[in-house]
Amino acid sequence: MLKKLIITAISASLVASAVFADSTNVGFRVSAGNLSASGTENTNLSGTDVTRAEKDANFEMASIFVERQIETSDKFNIIIGLDYVPMTADVATLGGGTGFDAKVSAGNLFTAYVQPTFIVNDTISVFGKVGFASGDLEINNISRQATTAGTASTDAAQDKTLEGTVFGIGAQMNRAAGVFIRLEATQTDFDKIRHTNSNSKVLTADAEMELISLSIGKSF
């Protein structure tokens, strides 16, 4: 339901851009982030959890963005944007001798967002952000070794889609010639992913990403 509301808001903002004066923003973003994940492994489709793993990793990454800025009034703008992160990072790693060790990695993350912005003065503005993120998910390094219980799987690597909602707040400083600098904090809550291997063992992983980002861009 929340995803539908976000998509509806982005679509409505695009329609509104035809009515109000607007401009285009482009730029790049550098982020310091924390990725926390938890996972479980079940013995089979109806079994209880036998393995739990948690991971907390700090990292840095860069992205590029393009935006349409809708100037609704002297004090309020709405920005519709798309951000691309050419990243690959581990989301979860589950280990053990039960025949279903696996590494879960995410990459090529796209985020579509709406950014309502309140203009404090000619130099400073503050904003909130809500969006939807989607990326590639790879499940690889799946254990296929023989075990005493005969529980080894015969799986190959799997590709899935990683999706989640994004929320954030930030501030922007406007400079000369349309250049701006932003500082923002965002949180992405990814949907739980689920994978069942060839002998009915079930892997689930839940991930959350927090970013502190510095952006430099230009308006045209």
Model features per residue range: what roles?
Residues 2-8:
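Sec-dependent signal peptide recognition
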Residues 8-14:
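Bacterial N-terminal signal peptides
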Residues 2, 18-220:
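Gram-negative outer-membrane beta-barrel domains
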